[in-house]
């Protein structure tokens, strides 16, 4: 097993390639995230944080460079292989929870497991375990509309870990919450990541939250540097 959950090597990405208005977003971004490591990612709006996360999470492709997830080289893989790697090895958390409103908290965590071929009983047991880890066991049967913003995001954290990924990618995971709730929910996120032993790359504008991670990277003119 690889010692790295994520390897990005010389990632390059531009838009409007070859045109007068070409925008070079990533100009050779490289990093390695070790198993169990939590890394912060900071940069101004429009600097390419979301683009980098989408490439790392196999939602987009780089123009050049190499991506490995959990020791698997995914650069140049077929669409089917990329989809399998994305579903099985990567968990996503966004600023807005995107929970399915017609399903309960536990069902929102069960569904991605069923899509991955997990038996219903096993999927429910894992979902309840994850909810218990974030203090949401008593709210398992509540739908998203019956939960507070902080509670909704806790469920979203659990859903991202439904299929036991090697890597969590989070894009401003507390950005939609008030400061007090943001701080509490971030503590929950850190405890969940630490408790499950996975790695995480977390983009945030909050430098105080970033400073609580193992290390912090900054996007500087399309290149990753230590902050």
From Swiss-Prot:
GO CC, any one term: plasma membrane
InterPro entries (UniProt xref): AAA+_ATPase, ABC_transporter-like_ATP-bd, ABC_transporter-like_CS, ABC_transpr_LolD-like, MacB-like_ATP-bd, P-loop_NTPase
Name of the protein in question: Lipoprotein-releasing system ATP-binding protein LolD
CDD domains: ABC_MJ0796_LolCDE_FtsE
Disulphide bond pairs: none
Taxonomic superkingdom: Bacteria
EC number: 7.6.2.-
Keywords carried by this UniProt record: ATP-binding, Cell inner membrane, Cell membrane, Membrane, Nucleotide-binding, Translocase, Transport
The organism's taxonomic lineage, starting at the top: Bacteria, Pseudomonadati, Pseudomonadota, Alphaproteobacteria, Rhodobacterales
UniProt GO MF annotations: ATP binding; ATP hydrolysis activity; transmembrane transporter activity
Annotated family: Belongs to the ABC transporter superfamily. Lipoprotein translocase (TC 3.A.1.125) family.
ABC transporter domain ranges (all copies): 6-227
Function: Part of the ABC transporter complex LolCDE involved in the translocation of mature outer membrane-directed lipoproteins, from the inner membrane to the periplasmic chaperone, LolA. Responsible for the formation of the LolA-lipoprotein complex in an ATP-dependent manner.
Annotated binding of ATP, by residue: 43-50
Chief localisation class: membrane
């Amino acid at each position: 097993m690889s010692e790295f959950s994520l390897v990005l090597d010389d990632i390059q990405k531009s838009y409007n390639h070859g045109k007068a208005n070409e925008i070079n977003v990533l100009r050779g971004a490289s990093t390695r995230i070790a198993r169990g490591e939590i890394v912060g990612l900071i940069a101004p709006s429009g600097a390419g944080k979301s683009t980098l996360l989408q490439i790392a999470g196999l939602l987009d492709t780089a123009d050049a460079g190499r991506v490995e997830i959990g020791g698997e080289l995914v650069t140049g893989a077929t669409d089917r292989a990329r989809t399998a790697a994305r579903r099985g090895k990567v968990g996503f958390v966004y600023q807005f929870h995107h929970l399915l409103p017609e399903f309960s908290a536990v069902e929102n965590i069960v569904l991605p497991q069923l899509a991955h071929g997990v038996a219903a009983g096993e999927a429910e047991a894992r979902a309840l375990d994850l909810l218990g880890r974030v203090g949401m066991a008593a709210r398992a049967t509540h739908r998203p509309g019956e939960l507070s913003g902080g509670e909704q995001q806790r469920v979203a954290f659990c859903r991202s870990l439904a299929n036991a990924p090697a890597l969590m990618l989070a894009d401003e995971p507390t950005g939609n919450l008030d400061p007090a709730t943001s701080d509490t929910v971030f503590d929950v996120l850190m405890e969940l990541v630490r408790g499950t032993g996975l790695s995480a790359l977390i983009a945030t504008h909050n430098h105080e939250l970033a400073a609580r991670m193992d290390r912090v990277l900054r996007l500087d003119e399309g290149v990753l540097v230590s902050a």
